[in-house]
Structure formats: structure tokens, C-alpha cells
């Protein structure tokens, strides 16, 4: 038994070390094809650039986390760098929010108190607006700036356009979610949407109310045509995302029914060639290399907005 514990400890340490060696991305800036980060300064020929702002996910609802994203998570966004649409070249800006803390903090998730003040999501929306205005001041046309995001970053994207519809050209939400594994934890597949959400409300009434508040705001105010990707096996909001179809102009793409796209098995790739993992969670399907099958859909959407 001791030998087993020793083996597991060494195995975990080895994996942690390999990932820590440049795998995680901890700072803002423009990304290169080789995942190098360059600080925002002067943008060469800004009128002929398309800027995609990447909003990462979160490890908790309202608190800090150790890093903002990682190579495997952002690889597909990086694959769009230098693509040209109508003579305009795509750039990718990684926007880190890992140090932002909501007014009620990390412990609120375990509380039944109604949320008071600005949540981390609210502050991330403001952070995006500040960056958009900075890019515009550097000469990038507003219509050529796109707010995008995965998970909590995807929900940030939807909230951004419900509050600031004219500030950017468009947005892409990947697996929007920020309220835990609703689909899986509350057995939506077995019990149905209504019963699943009722159980969520019973267990976490304050969190249920804030999610409902955000969803209602988006349904009421979002008028900008956006692109959204979801997957039915996403344990977070995979089976609780049909409300997106009620939004006029929303193009929702249900990626697939399993862990393949166009008949190909899906893998995530890290920094090294050996960092190759099968996708076993629908929440990560937009991060698997097979998802690049949808790059033409993304490029077509961007082209329709500039």
C-alpha cells in the first residue's frame, strides 16, 4: 500500500511539473501562434486588424485562481490567429481575470444570502469594456473587435452584449456556464429540466436566483447577433441551455452528441506532444483540436459582422 501511495505521489508530481513548465498562461496580452504573450501597446495597421478577446473560465464563482488559462484550453483560439477576412488579419488578446474578486467573494457560493454588490462576472464585463475602449483608442474599428469566452467567460460574453450592445462588433460564447455542474449534479437527463432546476433552487436558492437574474437580463436585453456553442454532455449547462434559442439573432451550434466531430475522436493537446488527452467531458469539447472543424463557421460569423 505504501508503494502505491509513493507511486501515485510521484505520478501526480510529474504531471504537475510538466504542466507548470510553461503550460499555464498567467498574463494579459496578444498571443502568437507559439503561445507567446506580448503586452498591449501600439497596434500596427489597426484598421486592418480583427481583434478577438479571449475570456477564460473560472475555477470558482467569485474568487481568485492561480492562472487564467492554459495552452490546451486556448489552442483552438490560437488557430485563428493570422486568418484573413476581407483583407483584415485576426489577432487574439488573452484577457486575464484570475485576480478579480467579486464583492461577496469565494465563500458566497456556500451561502444562502442573496448576492449584494458586483459579482466577479459583473466586474469582468467592465474589464472587457475597458479593454475594448483601449483598442478603439489605438485605432481598431469598434466593429472589428469581438468579445469571446469559454464557460464563465462565455457567460461574461453574453452579459457584455446585453449591457453594451454597441461597443463591439460581435461575440462568441463557448459552453456558457458559471453556476456549477447543473446538468449532471441535478440529474437533468433523468429528471428533466424543470425538476433539475427545482432541486438546484432548493439546495442553493441564492445561486439559483442570481443565475435566473442573469439569464433574464440576457433574454430581455441581448439584441446583437451572437454565435454560441453548446454540447449535450457538458455537465455544467449542457442540458440547460435551450433558453439561448429564444434570443433573436442567436446562432446556437450544438457541437455533437458524443465526443467526436465529423467522425473523428477528440483530443486536447498541451504544451508538449506527449500532452494528449481524450475528451471525456462535454464542457471541454470546444478545446479539443477536432473543434477546429468549426473554424469556417466562426470565420463566416466574424465576416458577417465587420
Mark where each language-model region is.
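Alpha/beta-hydrolase active-site loop
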Residues: 112-138
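Primarily recognizes the serine-hydrolase "nucleophile elbow" in alpha/beta-hydrolase
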Residues: 134-136, 143-191
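N-terminal cap/lid segment of alpha/beta-hydrolase-fold proteins
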Residues: 21-45
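Active-site-adjacent alpha-helix of alpha/beta-hydrolase-fold enzymes
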Residues: 69-81, 230-273
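Short, surface-exposed "cap/lid" segments of acyl-processing enzymes
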Residues: 43-85
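The feature captures the conserved acid-bearing segment of alpha/beta-hydrolase catalytic domains
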Residues: 178-255
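C-terminal catalytic histidine-bearing segment of alpha/beta-hydrolase fold enzymes
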Residues: 251-306
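Cap/lid segment of the alpha/beta-hydrolase catalytic domain
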Residues: 92-122
Amino acid at each position: 500500500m505504501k508503494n502505491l501511495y509513493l507511486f501515485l505521489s510521484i505520478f501526480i508530481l510529474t504531471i504537475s511539473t510538466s504542466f507548470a513548465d510553461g503550460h499555464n498562461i498567467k498574463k494579459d496580452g496578444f498571443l502568437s501562434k507559439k503561445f507567446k504573450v506580448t503586452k498591449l501597446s501600439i497596434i500596427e495597421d489597426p484598421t486592418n486588424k480583427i481583434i478577438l478577446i479571449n475570456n477564460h473560465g473560472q475555477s470558482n464563482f467569485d474568487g481568485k485562481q492561480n492562472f487564467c488559462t492554459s495552452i490546451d484550453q486556448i489552442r483552438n483560439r490560437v488557430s485563428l490567429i493570422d486568418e484573413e477576412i476581407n483583407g483584415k488579419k485576426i489577432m487574439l488578446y488573452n484577457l486575464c481575470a484570475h485576480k478579480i474578486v467579486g464583492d461577496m467573494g469565494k465563500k458566497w457560493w456556500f451561502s444562502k444570502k442573496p448576492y449584494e454588490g458586483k459579482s466577479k462576472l459583473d466586474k469582468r464585463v467592465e474589464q472587457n469594456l475597458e479593454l475594448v475602449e483601449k483598442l478603439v483608442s489605438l485605432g481598431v474599428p469598434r466593429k472589428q473587435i469581438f468579445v469571446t469566452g469559454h464557460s464563465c467567460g462565455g457567460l461574461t460574453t453574453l452579459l457584455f452584449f446585453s449591457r453594451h450592445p454597441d461597443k463591439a462588433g460581435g461575440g462568441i460564447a463557448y459552453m456558457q456556464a458559471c453556476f456549477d455542474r447543473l446538468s449532471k449534479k441535478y440529474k437533468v437527463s433523468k429528471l428533466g429540466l424543470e425538476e433539475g432546476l427545482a432541486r438546484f433552487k432548493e439546495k442553493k436558492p441564492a445561486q439559483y436566483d442570481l443565475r435566473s437574474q442573469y439569464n433574464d437580463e440576457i433574454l430581455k436585453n441581448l439584441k446583437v447577433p451572437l454565435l454560441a456553442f453548446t454540447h449535450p454532455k457538458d455537465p455544467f449547462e449542457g442540458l440547460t441551455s435551450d433558453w439561448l434559442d429564444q434570443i433573436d439573432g442567436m446562432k446556437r451550434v450544438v457541437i455533437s452528441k458524443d465526443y467526436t466531430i465529423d467522425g473523428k475522436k477528440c483530443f486536447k493537446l498541451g504544451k508538449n506532444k506527449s500532452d494528449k488527452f481524450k475528451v471525456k467531458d462535454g464542457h471541454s469539447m470546444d478545446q479539443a483540436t477536432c473543434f477546429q472543424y468549426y473554424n469556417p463557421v466562426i470565420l463566416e460569423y466574424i465576416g458577417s459582422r465587420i
